[in-house]
Amino acid sequence: MAAISVSSSPSIRCLRSACSDSSPALVSSTRVSFPAKISYLSGISSHRGDEMGKRMEGFVRSVDGKISDASFSEASSATPKSKVRKHTISVFVGDESGMINRIAGVFARRGYNIESLAVGLNRDKALFTIVVCGTERVLQQVIEQLQKLVNVLKVEDISSEPQVERELMLVKVNAHPESRAEIMWLVDTFRARVVDIAEHALTIEVTGDPGKMIAVERNLKKFQIREIVRTGKIALRREKMGATAPFWRFSAASYPDLKEQAPVSVLRSSKKGAIVPQKETSAGGDVYPVEPFFDPKVHRILDAHWGLLTDEDTSGLRSHTLSLLVNDIPGVLNIVTGVFARRGYNIQSLAVGHAETKGISRITTVIPATDESVSKLVQQLYKLVDVHEVHDLTHLPFSERELMLIKIAVNAAARRDVLDIASIFRAKAVDVSDHTITLQLTGDLDKMVALQRLLEPYGICEVARTGRVALARESGVDSKYLRGYSFPLTG
């Protein structure tokens, strides 16, 4: 450095100022001028033939190498950025009006775009399954913010654990007579089901992981897809073989040799009066136990016939199913749910997923309201910039489906009985361990409730459920009007 300080060359003075700056950007920009300086000094040494120029040339080369090594070591010593990947977050909350808006607001204020969201309610509690893209460190900060919300009981990121993940999709596709055979072949290949048949259209129900959904959509594109409605992803942890049974208290039918059956309390109160989940009743908090008792005085959430107008009931309240097409941008869910929250609507069901058009998402929600109030709500939703379409499917014939994953505590002796019950409801076993079995079921609410009632004696450990998804029937057949009527007699 002494040689540099006594030199009067302008290029060397520039080098001294660059060496005194610790900024990597300045070092790299100064290094660009070194070849010019070296060639300049080489020309001086060859012209004069003295050794002073050669020494200066060697000195500049050594300084250039040191600066290059320093900049490389500084870049390599920097902490590597964590990778951005998809995260599955489970949020267990107490059911309260405006809760969805508050949770969506936490993600919106941090610029996260929720890729899918499924909300399944169970009387006074709800389980949110949210899929977002982000880094580990920032997602951990979001989880800490969610835990500060009132009535949020448990928040957990289950992305890195072995899990059973499922999704439900309804696809309405053009089906002309010449292409119907190929479509039915694809339905059998992907183990899908046809839920509605019209003259020139088919509505197909598909369940599986997100990769299967993409494959089905890609193969049906050539037939022109009319509409797609998807639930968010739901997930349950896979139980390890040989592990100790954490759910033995749940199952009286599977473990009848137990001397004492301790009553299972889903929630307990702390000293401060806050409600916290019992540690022994959950495998990790990603799902919630189902209550073994049912109060007939409480309205069943998502009941298709809840609040129907009768001679004794003149309020006109009923469950309305709304379908919205919105832009797929960060914060749009917070804006839409804010309209419901400001008007005091308690959302009973919510399913958010990608629509048939790129950049568009479809929101399917169920709210209790009168026909008059819903018409005003639809007008308010149309005023939002990011909302393209709003349809009230309540008074139209529509296909509705829900997806449920349910984990039952069974041993080897009771496993056969549970599988027999599952076969009646066309449920599938998706995971089996020494002490549990996990079933997958699709259908309407009545089907879900009926299966839960039959499985309660065996011990229901955990339940993950999507909200309701619906598409209007192209056939125009409404099965509601066929209920309660006997088949016509033929002579």
Swiss-Prot record:
Q: Output one GO MF annotation.
A: acetolactate synthase regulator activity
User: Gene3D superfamilies attached here?
Assistant: 3.30.70.260, ACT-like. Chain A, domain 2
Phenotype when changing G98E = Increased feedback inhibition by valine/isoleucine
Q: Where is the ACT domain?
A: 88-160, 321-395
What subunit structure does UniProt give? The acetolactate synthase complex contains both large catalytic subunits and small regulatory subunits. The active enzyme may have an alpha(4)beta(4) structure. The acetolactate synthase complex contains 4 homodimers of the large catalytic subunits, and 1 homotetramer of the small regulatory subunits.
- Give the chief site where it resides: plastid
Task: Reproduce the miscellaneous comment text.
Answer: Plants overexpressing AHASS1 exhibit tolerance to low-oxygen stress.
Organism of derivation? Arabidopsis thaliana (Mouse-ear cress)
Instruction: Report, from the record, the phenotype seen after gene disruption.
Output: No visible phenotype under normal growth conditions. The double mutants aip1 and aip3 exhibit a lethal phenotype; they fail to develop adult organs, are chlorotic and die.
Give the similarity note. Belongs to the acetolactate synthase small subunit family.
Question: What stretch of residues directs this protein to its organelle as a transit peptide?
Answer: 1-61
Q: Its GO CC terms?
A: chloroplast; peroxisome
The cellular location(s) given in this protein's UniProt record come to: Plastid, Chloroplast; Peroxisome
- Give the matching NCBIfam families: acolac_sm, PRK11895.1
The pathway this protein participates in, as annotated, is: Amino-acid biosynthesis; L-isoleucine biosynthesis; L-isoleucine from 2-oxobutanoate: step 1/4; Amino-acid biosynthesis; L-valine biosynthesis; L-valine from pyruvate: step 1/4
List the SUPFAM superfamilies: ACT-like
The organism's place on the tree of life at top rank: Eukaryota
Name of the protein this chain belongs to: Acetolactate synthase small subunit 1, chloroplastic
What does the tissue specificity note say?
Highly expressed in leaves and stems. Expressed in roots, flowers and siliques.
> Per the entry, what induces it?
Induced by submergence and low oxygen stress.
Which residues does the record give as L-valine binding sites? Answer: D95, M99, I100, N113, I114, D328, V332, L333, N346, I347
PANTHER family, per database record: ACETOLACTATE SYNTHASE SMALL SUBUNIT, ACETOLACTATE SYNTHASE SMALL SUBUNIT 1, CHLOROPLASTIC
Would you kindly state one Gene Ontology biological process term found in this protein's UniProt entry? isoleucine biosynthetic process
